[in-house]
């Protein structure tokens, strides 16, 4: 697979002897190889070593990745593509599940608008990245409703809808071509943008975050905390926590927005498609779930609230 220079290893530990390192896909006992394939103990008096590296492939975040690993493209079959944030364990069943944003796995639904429902197909890669029905890896299991406001948000209240129908008929009779719609006076607050999906039988999972490593626990958010994330669009980026307990309004479309409280504000460390990324300390401790941002800031939900509301734990 390759060759280079490195310290000879014994029992997986480096020694003080620098030599030629031969990289192989898989180590094989010498007696099972033709003599011409044997690596000599020395080359011109320089010691050699053989290191197993497996199959070397280019990291892909927007293509098909198996086993599933956090940091790659994923999404609801109707939606675009976001990032698989983490592998979590369902506290109810003990089964491993996939964690990302509601707007990634559940199409931004509040549970009543028809955008998504439990059991919907989840694709890896996401539909925007070319994912098809054949790329279905999970089914939507549960989500925290995502409430929005704006011109596209109709009222669910039966009384309001009844008034709307009557007023609409009156206005239409007086002024054909015109109508009446009733909207909520104030949007409900959101604390997290989060959902989990249940993998299909036979779909293998690797909880190791791409280019980051194992998730080692949860860190207490504090201003100035140095963090990193692994996302579908911008890959591995680093940032710093700037604001705690933020209340922010996030655009959901040209005419709708969602109001969030208890948010974490970081320096800019993502772009569209990075939504759902797990934000961690360099030591691998989870801090937040990336949900929104701009070219100047990144907004994330506190991972503790995410896990609590979905009744899951980090795997």
Residue ranges and their predicted role:
Residues 1-88:
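Noncatalytic regulatory segments and standalone regulatory/sensor domains
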Residues 60-263, 267, 280-283, 291, ...:
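Serine endopeptidase catalytic core focused on the charge-relay Asp
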Residues 271-274:
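Short, small/polar residue-rich loop motifs at catalytic or cofactor-binding pockets
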Residues 286:
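Glycine-rich acetyl-CoA-binding "A-motif" of GNAT/NAT acetyltransferases
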């Amino acid at each position: 697979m390759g060759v280079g220079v490195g310290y000879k290893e014994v029992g997986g530990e480096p020694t003080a002897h620098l030599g030629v390192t031969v990289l192989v896909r898989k180590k094989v006992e010498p007696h099972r190889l033709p003599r011409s394939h044997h690596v000599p103990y020395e080359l011109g008096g320089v010691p050699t070593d053989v290191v197993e590296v497996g199959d070397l492939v280019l990291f892909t975040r927007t293509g098909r990745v198996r086993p599933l690993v956090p940091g790659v493209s994923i999404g609801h079959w109707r939606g675009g593509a976001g990032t698989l944030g983490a592998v979590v364990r369902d506290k109810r069943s003990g089964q491993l599940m996939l964690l990302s944003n509601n707007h990634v796995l559940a199409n931004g639904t509040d549970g009543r608008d028809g955008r998504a429902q439990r059991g919907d197909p989840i694709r890896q890669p996401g539909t925007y990245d070319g994912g098809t029905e054949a790329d279905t890896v999970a089914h939507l299991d549960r989500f925290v409703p995502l409430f929005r406001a704006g011109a596209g948000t109709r009222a669910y209240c039966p009384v309001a809808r009844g008034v709307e129908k009557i007023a609409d008929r009156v206005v239409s009779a007086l002024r054909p071509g015109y109508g009446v719609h009733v909207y909520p006076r104030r949007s409900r607050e959101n604390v997290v943008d989060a959902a989990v999906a249940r993998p299909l039988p036979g779909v293998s999972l690797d909880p190791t975050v791409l280019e980051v490593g194992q998730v080692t626990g949860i860190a207490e958010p504090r201003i100035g905390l140095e963090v990193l994330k692994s996302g579908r669009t911008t890959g591995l980026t680093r940032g710093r926590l700037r604001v705690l307990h933020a209340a922010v309004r996030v655009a959901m479309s040209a005419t709708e927005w969602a109001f969030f409280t208890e948010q974490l504000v970081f320096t800019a460390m993502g772009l569209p498609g990075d939504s759902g990324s797990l934000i961690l300390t360099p030591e691998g401790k989870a801090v937040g779930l990336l949900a929104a941002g701009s070219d100047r800031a990144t907004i994330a939900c506190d991972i503790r609230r995410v896990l609590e509301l979905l009744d899951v734990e980090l795997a």
